[in-house]
Curated annotation (Swiss-Prot):
Belongs to the tachykinin family. GO terms for molecular function: substance P receptor binding. The record marks P59, K60, Q63, F64, F65, G66, L67 as: Cleavage. Residues 1-19 form the signal peptide. Residues 20-56 form a propeptide. PANTHER family: PROTACHYKININ-1, TACHYKININ. GO terms for biological process: associative learning; cellular response to nerve growth factor stimulus; chemical synaptic transmission; inflammatory response; long-term memory; negative regulation of heart rate; neuropeptide signaling pathway; positive regulation of action potential. This is Protachykinin-1. It comes from Mus musculus (Mouse). GO terms for cellular component: axon; extracellular region; extracellular space; neuronal cell body; neuronal dense core vesicle; synapse. It is found in: Secreted. InterPro entries: Tachy_Neuro_lke_CS (IPR013055), Tachykinin_dom (IPR008215), Tachykinin_fam (IPR008216). The modification Methionine amide is found at M68, M107.
Length: 130
C-alpha cells in the first residue's frame, strides 16, 4: 500500500514539474498570436475545418420535420402567395384539396363548426355507452 502511495506522489510531482517547464516556454501574448485570420486558416488542418463547416451549416428545408409533418422541398414564398390568392378568389384554383370544415392538429381531428362537433361528440358518447 505504501508503494502505491509513493508511486502516486512521484507521478503527481513529475506532472507538476513537467507543467512548470511548459509554462516557462509559453509567451505571454498567446491570444494575440491567434488574432490574424490567416494564421488560423494555416494552423487548422483540412479535416477539422471541414468538420466545423458541417456543424455550422443550416439544415436544408427537406431535412426539417416539424410538428406538422414534412415540409415540401420546393415550397417558397411565391407558392404561398399564389395559394392565398387562389383561396380568396384572386387567381386560379390550385390542385390541392382544401377542407374547411375540419382541422387536424396535435390533439386529433376537430370540426370547426361547433354544431357538428357537438353532434359527433354525442354520437361517440352513445356508442361507448352501449
Amino acid at each position: 500500500m505504501k508503494i502505491l502511495v509513493a508511486v502516486a506522489v512521484f507521478f503527481l510531482v513529475s506532472t507538476q514539474l513537467f507543467a512548470e517547464e511548459i509554462d516557462a516556454n509559453d509567451d505571454l501574448n498567446y491570444w494575440s498570436d491567434w488574432s490574424d485570420s490567416d494564421q488560423i486558416k494555416e494552423a487548422m488542418p483540412e479535416p477539422f475545418e471541414h468538420l466545423l463547416q458541417r456543424i455550422a451549416r443550416r439544415p436544408k428545408p427537406q431535412q426539417f420535420f416539424g410538428l406538422m409533418g414534412k415540409r415540401d422541398a420546393d415550397s417558397s414564398v411565391e407558392k404561398q402567395v399564389a395559394l392565398l390568392k387562389a383561396l380568396y378568389g384572386h387567381g386560379q384554383i390550385s390542385h390541392k384539396r382544401h377542407k374547411t370544415d375540419s382541422f387536424v392538429g396535435l390533439m386529433g381531428k376537430r370540426a370547426l363548426n361547433s354544431v357538428a362537433y357537438e353532434r359527433s361528440a354525442m354520437q361517440n358518447y352513445e356508442r361507448r355507452r352501449k
